[in-house]
Amino acid sequence: MSHANIRPAEHLAYAQRERLAFIELRVYFCGNLTRAHIERRFGVKPAASARDLIAYRALAPHNLQYSAASRCYLPTKAFRPIFKH
């Protein structure tokens, strides 16, 4: 299935879709992402940022990898945006 045909997160609340789109943009353009980035940007608690990362990884399982050495998420070589930006 082509990523272009995926309509991600239609069942999620608007606020969570915005956070998931931020996850994608941040990791794609900045090259890394931590839960703290989500927490600072949106003013959410650590549990919410963890849920957002779980949700994004469920929608795009091949886009992010966790680097224990860097303690952050990095884009994979297979990264393909799922949100229309």
Describe each model-derived feature in a short phrase.
Residues 1-85:
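Short, basic/aromatic recognition patches that contact phosphate-bearing ligands
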